[in-house]
Amino acid sequence: HALEDWAETWAHYLLMHETLETAVEFEVIRPPETDREFHVWLSEWMQLVLVLNALNRSIGNADAYPFVVSTAVQKKLQFIHDLMHDI
C-alpha cells in the first residue's frame, strides 16, 4: 500500500513540523537561526517529545508521542523534509 504509506509519512511529518513550530511560538524551544538540516530537526523533535512524554507521565497520562522513529521511518521523513526545503 504505497499510497497509504506515503500519506501516513506526510501526516507524521506535518505533525512533527507543526508541533515544533508551536513550541517555538510558545518559546519552549529556540527558533532556528537557519533552515534546519534533517538530522538537527529530528534531534530537536526527539528532545521535545522526551519532555512532552515526561510531563504527561508526571500527571499520570500516557505518552504524548508513543512512537519509535526507526531508521526506515527516518529515511522517509528525510525525503519529505528535503522535498519541502527544495521548493
What kind of region is each of these model predictions?
Residues 2-87:
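Pan-zinc metallopeptidase signature
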